[in-house]
């Protein structure tokens, strides 16, 4: 992967890609729970790999954005790119349709019909990043919610409805 090409691309796409990629871990792991059936080998491997769709992004995300803004790829940008492209690619191919999406993307789909959200041209990953917070609250993952809430603030991701221009009237 030529990290310089990505470092020269608009930062907003890397930013949104981070938000979307992180959902892969949270949706995959929550969807895999409680099915009653034992997961087959490929699916289990995909669920385990999904950790690499979030952990490196949380660790390196802010620094990777800086490297991209400065058009100087380094370790942080490389780790984030690998999470977005390689880890997500493996997980998507290993876990099957039932674990490839979940509450964060369902909420995203709901926000796409909100006129106020649509009018402001929010990127897919931007709204999905907010919807990860919804998923964590609904799933009662309070410690993880706090961690991802702080990460989201540091990344400039939305952390409240007003940040995506959604209103109760929508």
Write out the residue ranges for each language-model feature:
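A glycine/threonine-rich phosphate-anchoring loop and its flanking beta-alpha core
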Residues: 1-46
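Proline-rich low-complexity regions
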Residues: 3, 83-86, 158
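General structural signal for secondary-structure boundaries
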Residues: 9, 33-35, 73-77, 168-170
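A short secondary-structure junction motif
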Residues: 25, 29-33, 64, 87, ...
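Secondary-structure boundary/capping residues
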Residues: 31, 66, 120, 160-161
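C-terminal charged capping/lid subdomain of soluble metabolic enzymes
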Residues: 140-170
């Amino acid at each position: 992967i030529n990290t310089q090409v990505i470092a020269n691309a608009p930062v907003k796409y890397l930013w949104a890609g981070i938000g979307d990629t992180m959902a892969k871990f949270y949706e995959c792991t929550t969807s895999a729970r409680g099915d009653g059936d034992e997961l087959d080998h490929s699916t289990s491997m995909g669920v385990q790999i999904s950790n690499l769709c979030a952990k490196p992004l949380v660790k390196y995300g802010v620094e990777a954005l800086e490297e991209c803004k400065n058009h100087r790829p380094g370790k942080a940008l490389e780790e984030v790119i690998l999470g977005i492209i390689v880890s997500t690619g493996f997980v998507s191919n290993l876990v099957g349709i039932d674990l490839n999406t979940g509450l964060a993307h369902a909420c995203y789909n709901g926000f796409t019909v909100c006129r106020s959200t649509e009018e402001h041209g929010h990127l897919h990953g931007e709204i999905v990043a907010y919807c990860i917070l919804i998923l964590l609250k609904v799933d009662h993952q309070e410690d993880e919610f706090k961690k991802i809430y702080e990460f989201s603030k540091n990344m400039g991701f939305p952390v409240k409805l007003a940040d995506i221009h959604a209103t109760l009237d929508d």
